[in-house]
Amino acid sequence: MTNNVRGYLQLHPFHLVGPSPWPIFTSFSLMDLAFSIALNSHGYMANNFYIILSIITVLYSMTLWFKDIIAESTYLGDHTIAVKRGLNQGFLLFVVSEILIFASLFWAYLHSAVNPTMDLGMSWPPVGIDVISPAELPLLNTIILLASGVTITYAHHALINGNRANTLYGFIYSTLLIALFVMFQFLEYKYAGFTITDGVYGSTFYSLTGLHGLHMIMLTIMLVICTWRVYNYDFTNTSHVGAETTILYLHVLDVIWLFIYIIVYWWGS
């Protein structure tokens, strides 16, 4: 479908998208993944089979969900003004919920860090914890995330101005930077001197950084999809809701990481 025809079909203010099964399927898959991780952490599972199965179901549900969204917006012309408004409002509510989740985890961390008990040796970090230096991989990851914020902003401005080539380059660079961040985060976990079972410090540290890492993996998938859609001429300078939500998602995760770096890595060390 050409952009002119698609724009004509999207002018009226009616909601054309029908009910979708994928949101509820994705929600149950995520809940199953959370339960699997919790049970595995407490030793109720002998292996990681259910975690791997949950990850597969999450990715499968999200793949079909994204496929339907792309088909509805690009090929069917169902993303009218009302649909776009609903997508933007829904994503803003998602961002607010994510901020509240991270706020609760920061609260849990600071509750023990500000007033450590005798069980923690009256000190923070607790006695016996070999903390990760904030001047090593965490600092490098911070620089990488700030750089990704620059490249995605460059891509956003290029998209608004109708410069497809620079938009594509910006999304490619951003995708590579976020993937590099995830890889360095994995290396940090691999060589860390403590685990999630090492008391309140280990549990709050891995809960904060691990949840952020899961969101970064999700962001990588979204960036790959946006990069492909830019390459496939799916976005125009006036219609690019998927790109805008991905860009906002990246900036929100950038800000959350800055709080993690300052509070957990720098102040908490």
From Swiss-Prot:
The reaction(s) this protein catalyses: 4 Fe(II)-[cytochrome c] + O2 + 8 H(+)(in) = 4 Fe(III)-[cytochrome c] + 2 H2O + 4 H(+)(out)
Coarse class of the protein's main subcellular location: mitochondrion
Gene3D superfamilies membership: 1.10.287.70, Cytochrome c oxidase, subunit III, four-helix bundle
Membrane-traversing stretches: 7-29, 51-71, 90-110, 127-147, 167-187, 205-225, 247-267
Keywords: Membrane, Mitochondrion, Mitochondrion inner membrane, Translocase, Transmembrane, Transmembrane helix
Tree of life domain: Eukaryota
Key word Membrane present: yes
Assigned EC number: 7.1.1.9
Function: Component of the cytochrome c oxidase, the last enzyme in the mitochondrial electron transport chain which drives oxidative phosphorylation. The respiratory chain contains 3 multisubunit complexes succinate dehydrogenase (complex II, CII), ubiquinol-cytochrome c oxidoreductase (cytochrome b-c1 complex, complex III, CIII) and cytochrome c oxidase (complex IV, CIV), that cooperate to transfer electrons derived from NADH and succinate to molecular oxygen, creating an electrochemical gradient over the inner membrane that drives transmembrane transport and the ATP synthase.
SUPFAM superfamilies: Cytochrome c oxidase subunit III-like (SSF81452)
Localization (cell): Mitochondrion inner membrane
One example of a Gene Ontology biological process annotation: mitochondrial electron transport, cytochrome c to oxygen
UniProt family annotation: Belongs to the cytochrome c oxidase subunit 3 family.
A GO cellular-component term linked to this record: respiratory chain complex IV
Cross-referenced InterPro entries: Cyt_c/ubiquinol_Oxase_su3 (IPR024791), Cyt_c_oxase_su3_dom (IPR033945), Cyt_c_oxidase-like_su3 (IPR000298), Cyt_c_oxidase_su3-like_sf (IPR035973), Cyt_c_oxidase_su3_a-hlx (IPR013833)
Upper classification of the organism: Eukaryota, Fungi, Dikarya, Ascomycota, Saccharomycotina
MF GO annotations: cytochrome-c oxidase activity; ubiquinone binding
Name recorded for this polypeptide: Cytochrome c oxidase subunit 3
Subunit relationships: Component of the cytochrome c oxidase (complex IV, CIV), a multisubunit enzyme composed of a catalytic core of 3 subunits and several supernumerary subunits. The complex exists as a monomer or a dimer and forms supercomplexes (SCs) in the inner mitochondrial membrane with ubiquinol-cytochrome c oxidoreductase (cytochrome b-c1 complex, complex III, CIII).
Membrane topology of the entry: Multi-pass membrane protein
